[in-house]
């Protein structure tokens, strides 16, 4: 999901597109970039290219259906070429997945509630899945009926089944979580959740450090047991109660702070002061992310963002960019047993 290299987007379904990867600001990705990434992900899960329908009409409204509700794409249980009409009922009768893509996470809950969930309500089959994809969150939605009551459930991307199989809720493992392009954006979203929960800035950064150390501790614990369930999970999607979730996560926090505490500049509490609902929302973002395999520049950018706030350091300088470091190492070509030092002399 990187923005490096050629700025042209090549879609597995439509070929090379006229839209670039980057938006007008030159820094962030376009919505089309994320749509193609979602398509590539599903193809990697065995969903046939010929079964994709780009921008299908999901519902028609108004006089003679003049207004329409579209999704970014749908995956059908038959080749799209076999559907001779663009009528919503014909498409929805074969829809396996309906996807909505956004370029950022700013209105994620609004989009989920007004676009993704209604798409599932319009679906003809109970087995149809909804997919939400943005720069931070990738979530799958499905319908469950219990005692005649329908409920739309939500879970991490790892729940998406291979083509032809039903959805199955399985715990996250070290081998199923993935690094992200921006830890900064991920933790800014977590900071926003804490802000909405009325935590002051200083307390928010303390909680973020607790969460970061706990996540790293958990990943290291399961790195050599890659197929065993992690202790930091998207517990709501697994049907775990809020009280049980708080206890499970709280136990890991205590062990993590005990392990890392003596290496921290300041004493850090080993009690996480979060309500069940707030913890659920944070775990939804944090649990699917693999931090310890993130690239150096991703970790560096994150560190410079949050370390200053955590420890009130006056950082007048920035780390040497990793591109410069890599360039110099390539030129110097150190051999076994040799070391290169960056004296940080300004």
PLM-predicted stretches and their roles:
Residues 102-151:
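Nucleic-acid nuclease catalytic cores
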Residues 36-43, 207-219:
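Short, hydrophobic/amphipathic alpha-helical patches that form generic packing surfaces
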């Amino acid at each position: 999901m990187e923005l490096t290299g050629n700025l042209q987007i090549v879609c597995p379904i439509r070929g090379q597109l006229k839209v670039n990867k980057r938006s007008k600001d030159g820094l962030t990705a376009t919505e089309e970039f994320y749509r193609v990434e979602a398509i590539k992900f599903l193809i990697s899960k065995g969903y046939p290219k010929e079964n994709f329908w780009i921008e299908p009409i999901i519902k028609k409204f108004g006089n003679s259906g003049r207004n329409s509700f579209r999704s970014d794409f749908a995956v059908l249980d038959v080749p799209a070429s076999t559907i001779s009409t663009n009528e919503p009922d014909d498409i929805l009768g074969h829809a396996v997945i309906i996807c909505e893509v956004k370029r950022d996470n700013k209105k994620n809950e609004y989009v989920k509630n007004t676009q993704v969930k209604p798409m599932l309500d319009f679906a003809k089959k109970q087995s149809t899945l909804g997919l939400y994809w943005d720069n931070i969150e990738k979530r799958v939605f499905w319908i469950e009926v219990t005692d005649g009551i329908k409920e739309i459930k939500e879970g991490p991307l790892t729940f998406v089944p291979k083509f032809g199989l039903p959805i199955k809720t399985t715990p996250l493992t070290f081998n199923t979580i993935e690094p992200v392009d921006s830890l900064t954006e991920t933790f800014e979203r977590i900071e926003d959740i804490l802000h909405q929960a009325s935590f002051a800035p200083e307390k928010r950064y303390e909680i973020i450090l607790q969460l970061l150390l706990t996540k790293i501790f958990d990943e290291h614990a399961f790195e050599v047991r890659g197929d065993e369930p992690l202790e930091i999970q998207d517990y709501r999607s697994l049907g775990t109660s809020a009280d049980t979730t708080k206890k499970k996560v709280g136990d890991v926090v205590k062990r993590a702070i005990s392990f890392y505490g003596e290496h921290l500049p300041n004493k850090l509490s080993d009690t996480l002061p979060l309500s069940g609902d707030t913890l659920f929302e944070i775990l939804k973002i944090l649990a699917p992310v693999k931090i310890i395999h993130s690239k150096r520049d991703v970790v560096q950018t994150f560190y410079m963002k949050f370390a200053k706030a955590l420890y009130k350091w006056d950082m007048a300088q920035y780390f040497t960019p990793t591109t410069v470091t890599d360039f110099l190492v390539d030129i110097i070509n150190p051999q076994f047993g040799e070391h290169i030092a960056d004296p940080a002399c300004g």
